[in-house]
């Protein structure tokens, strides 16, 4: 059982607050393996909600789930040179099985392009075999050397990876934007987190891709968090793995490919963006428990009648498809229960005491604002549904205001450095397009170009780093 109460204020020590909320709300725990975490029931239930929403989206457009082995031969990884170089520092290797050394080292899946695409070469023969549109929910291992943080950076994490193969470049480009659009809808409409979208620079793109598209969120401490990416792989992997097909023109062609993914770091973003000094604040659309009912019996004040009425409300709400819990445990006080469920981030609390029973009402409490309201018995179901909608909307609106307050436009390097030091957040600035200037900013400040907007914006000044003519406006930030 959780130790109720968060002792660190979000505004005073954000990092410590985050860790305390993760542990005390029973979202995760540390494991015996350094850098690996245990996802507890509460966080895994949120991941299941994300899976449910995203599976529905992609299955409607002909994508199907598969599962490939987590072991990848070293020779497969090495086939695409840029891809291999990008992942080699983080690969965990298996060198023996039992007491027997392996003839070839096996990588524990850092991503699945290579093992999947070797198989695509067997599956695809004709234009009739296209497109291939598959998705995999699995674990990934990347042996991080940086400091780890639950959900945000761990050596093992869960993710979804989509992989597609198409007959034309245009189909591939459309797929890249389709995936990014579905990610944005998932994150903004369900997780209530606003994002910026655009392209990565060549130095920040996925290893082996033509280009990478991204969605980036801003955390309360002024650091960006990459929420999901969608990659246009072009024909790079098709050339390496000989993925070809005979087209309608009876000629041989290489396929065009995409890959795209989101991870359990989305859960970390929900905690950071919406949480407060009492603990989690979960968006109703992904909250494992949307409503908790707490009976408040007093001695000599009809405890049986209060309990019966609480069960009645529980049944009504459950029949309406609302995720509701009745907390009628006698070993805990109502006050303890209030704190416990607030820490867990449950969006709505319903209280029923003797006076409420007499007046044929309940008291409803919003987790996001703490606002209390008396609701007549006949109106409870409708009031709960309305309150859940209002909370979802309010969480997004608050996060949108916070995001906009953390975007600053600067015209020179001095302004850039001062803004980064005092405020953090996204810094919109002009860039000449040179990787040397991008590297200089990163070396000097730790900030990287998080994205280049899809619609090129006319530069408002010379390049923020070198002072020469700029090509476009980009968004810089420090990041997780």
Predicted regions and their residues:
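NTP/phosphate- and nucleic-acid-binding module
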Residues: 1-480
């Amino acid at each position: 059982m959780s130790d109720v109460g968060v002792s660190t204020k979000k505004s005073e020590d954000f990092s410590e607050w985050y860790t305390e909320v993760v542990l005390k709300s029973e979202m995760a725990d540390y494991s015996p393996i350094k850098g690996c975490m245990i996802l507890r029931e509460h966080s895994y239930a949120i991941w299941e909600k994300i899976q449910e929403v995203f599976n529905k989206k992609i299955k409607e457009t002909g994508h199907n789930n598969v599962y490939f082995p987590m072991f990848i031969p070293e020779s497969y990884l090495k086939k695409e040179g840029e891809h291999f170089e990008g992942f080699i520092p983080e690969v965990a290797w298996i060198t023996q099985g039992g007491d027997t050394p392996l003839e070839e080292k096996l990588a524990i899946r850092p991503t699945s392009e290579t093992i999947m695409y070797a198989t695509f070469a067997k599956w695809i023969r004709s234009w009739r075999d296209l497109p291939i549109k598959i998705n995999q929910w699995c674990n990934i291992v990347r042996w991080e050397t940086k400091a780890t943080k639950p959900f945000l950076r761990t050596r093992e994490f869960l993710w979804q990876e989509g992989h597609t193969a198409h007959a034309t470049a245009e189909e591939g480009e459309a797929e890249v934007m389709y995936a990014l659009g579905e990610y944005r809808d998932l994150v903004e409409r369900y997780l209530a987190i606003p994002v910026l979208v655009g392209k990565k620079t060549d130095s920040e793109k996925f290893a082996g891709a033509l280009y990478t598209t991204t969605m980036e969120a801003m955390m309360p401490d002024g650091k960006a968090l990459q929420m999901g990416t969608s990659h246009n792989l072009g024909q790079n992997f098709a050339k390496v793995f000989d993925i070809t097909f005979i087209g309608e023109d009876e000629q041989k062609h290489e396929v065009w490919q995409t890959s795209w993914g989101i991870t359990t770091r989305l859960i970390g973003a929900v905690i950071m963006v919406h949480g407060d000094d009492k603990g989690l604040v979960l968006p109703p659309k992904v909250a494992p428990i949307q409503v908790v009912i707490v009976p408040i019996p007093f001695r000599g004040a009809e405890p049986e009648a209060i309990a019966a009425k609480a069960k009645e409300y529980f049944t009504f709400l459950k029949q309406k498809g609302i995720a509701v819990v009745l907390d009628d445990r006698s070993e805990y006080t109502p006050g303890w229960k209030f704190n416990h469920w607030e820490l867990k981030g449950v969006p709505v609390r319903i209280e029923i005491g003797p006076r409420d029973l007499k007046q044929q009402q309940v008291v409803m409490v919003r987790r996001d604002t703490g606002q209390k309201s008396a609701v007549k018995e006949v109106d409870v179901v409708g009031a709960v549904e309305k309150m859940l909608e209002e909370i979802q909307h309010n969480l997004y609106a608050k996060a949108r205001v916070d995001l906009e307050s953390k975007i600053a436009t600067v015209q020179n390097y001095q302004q850039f450095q001062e803004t980064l030091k005092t405020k953090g957040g996204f810094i919109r600035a002009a860039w000449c397009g040179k990787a040397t200037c991008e590297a200089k900013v990163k070396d000097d400040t730790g900030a990287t170009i998080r994205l280049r907007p899809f619609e090129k914006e006319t530069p408002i000044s010379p390049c923020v780093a070198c002072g020469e003519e700029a090509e476009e406006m980009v968004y810089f930030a420090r990041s997780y």
